[in-house]
Amino acid sequence: MSEKGRLFTSESVTEGHPDKICDAISDSVLDALLAADPRSRVAVETLVTTGQVHVVGEVATSAKEAFADITNTVRARILEIGYDSSDKGFDGATCGVNIGIGAQSPDIAQGVDTAHEARVEGAADPLDSQGAGDQGLMFGYAINATPELMPLPIALAHRLSRRLTEVRKNGVLPYLRPDGKTQVTIAYEDNVPVRLDTVVISTQHAADIDLEKTLDPDIREKVLNTVLDDLAHETLDASTVRVLVNPTGKFVLGGPMGDAGLTGRKIIVDTYGGWARHGGGAFSGKDPSKVDRSAAYAMRWVAKNVVAAGLAERVEVQVAYAIGKAAPVGLFVETFGTETEDPVKIEKAIGEVFDLRPGAIIRDLNLLRPIYAPTAAYGHFGRTDVELPWEQLDKVDDLKRAI
């Protein structure tokens, strides 16, 4: 069926958005613990509201000093984001920080530490000894629409959000404040992006800024035009784009004073902008024994290599686990009719090339490292500003040989 005139929209938010503050805090705590003890088991949730931060969850770690220093870790990340004054609605130096972290459940730990394969089935392979930390299903996706093999709407929305933060932090637009959102609507014909239809940019700003005379033209020139100038997708027509800057009017009250924030509430922003399916599990604050995170990363790794190998123009891969089991209970590959090889053969090749047991994913992607804080904003996938192991194209030749 023709898709002429169909519009698809994705959004992004800046690191100063209340939910993203929480993701950043949770991942900063995770990184601090992993840096001191790579075997730390971490499940940390954060809530922010006016003048307060609450950090709760479960942890098992030998990193006593890092654990004791969590309050300072929290404050440092808030200040780095840019909330350093009550004039901005939040101050990392003076806000209240409440820590309520307990120990990891031994019932969960037993299934992770000694998987069903080792405990019941007598498996001798060390990688069979680590079970999945929970049941669940995870998706990965890749498409040849952008150099980073991401859907164009979310890729463009993230570029705009990153640019908003960049012009604030480097002083190009010093009156901007940390909270902000972007939204991109693109017109598609036969599943190909052809026209940039609408861009929405909402940003927190100082109280004395004139929206019509200052904010709107500045955002168009310093944010939108800069991103569009760098847009590699040459066939995208941006000549008639509708631009909406702060369409509600002034945006002075932002951050935790404007809205409470919570870890894990931006899972579509974190992944594929709604273009691909999502298994439901959030990422931030979770160590890689949690397959919600590590297996979703592995699925992106799989999907990206499949597309890069030329086996399909776009692919979505699902994996599923049972708690306490090492081997996945299911693997499903969808190529949307864009495959160059039989999808059954592609699925078989994936099974031969990628070891999707949790212990193997952690080993192959080297996940027991403090690499997670940068992922807390601007997406976990398709990043061009940081190097992430699940974005590497190291299995292309292996997949071609397996086919």
Curated annotation (Swiss-Prot):
Its cofactor is Mg(2+); K(+). GO terms for biological process: one-carbon metabolic process; S-adenosylmethionine biosynthetic process. Pathway: Amino-acid biosynthesis; S-adenosyl-L-methionine biosynthesis; S-adenosyl-L-methionine from L-methionine: step 1/1. It is found in: Cytoplasm. It comes from the Bacteria. The keyword Iron does not apply. CDD domains: S-AdoMet_synt. Catalyzes the formation of S-adenosylmethionine (AdoMet) from methionine and ATP. The overall synthetic reaction is composed of two sequential steps, AdoMet formation and the subsequent tripolyphosphate hydrolysis which occurs prior to release of AdoMet from the enzyme. This is S-adenosylmethionine synthase. It comes from Mycobacterium bovis (strain ATCC BAA-935 / AF2122/97). The gene is metK.
